Amino acid sequence: MNLVGSYAHHHHHHHHHHHPHPAHPMLHEPFLFGPASRCHQERPYFQSWLLSPADAAPDFPAGGPPPTTAVRAAAASYGPDARPGQSPGRLEALGGRLGRRKGSGPKKERRRTESINSAFAELRECIPNVPADTKLSKIKTLRLATSYIAYLMDVLAKDAQAGDPEAFKAELKKADGGRESKRKRELQQHEGFPPALGPGEKRD
């Protein structure tokens, strides 16, 4: 173009410190605004493609669907039923097997946990001198039960009379309990039987 050529020509003279051409001050203006005017002419095409894809969709090649069609298809596959609280049919079908497995897992785990807690509650009831308002952890319950079993075995070995539960001291910080006397009576009734079966009772 003449514009670029004239600019290069005058810029060459200016670089070598020749006396400036009278038209030189005007060259910067067409050089700066010339490309801008060309970009301004090309910009509407980019705007129509970037900012309004719905309008530009018919111009896409026939090899693939326009984006708007793909979006409509994706929306239709989930449909208006995809509200909170309602699963789309496709997702429900895909996650059905896993969902059933997950659903049965927590129920089974919950039953197992309830069974364990029930067994620990029964075990706590068997330990004497534990206040009714005392909450024992599972590990503490096991340790107290183990020590109580050891105590009972020791009682049998020593051939004690009726195995007085007062001799067993549950290692707790709280010493008093409302149901303590009831437990003592129950244990005294139960304790009357095991010593009779002990190995030291067989005497001639």
Swiss-Prot record:
Main location (coarse class): nucleus
Ranges of Basic residues composition bias in the record: 8-22, 98-110
Annotated spans, Disordered: 1-24, 57-115, 172-204
Presence of the UniProt keyword Transcription in the record: yes
Domain bHLH: 100-152
Gene3D superfamilies the record matches: Helix-loop-helix DNA-binding domain
Modified residues (Phosphoserine): 115
Processing and modification events after translation: Phosphorylation by PLK4 disrupts the interaction with MDFIC and leads to translocation into the nucleoplasm, allowing dimerization and transcription factor activity.
Record's subunit section: Efficient DNA binding requires dimerization with another bHLH protein. Forms homodimers and heterodimers with TCF3 gene products E12 and E47, HAND2 and HEY1, HEY2 and HEYL (hairy-related transcription factors). Interacts with MDFIC. Interacts with SOX15; the interaction enhances HAND1-induced differentiation of trophoblast giant cells.
Protein known as: Heart- and neural crest derivatives-expressed protein 1
Organism: Ovis aries
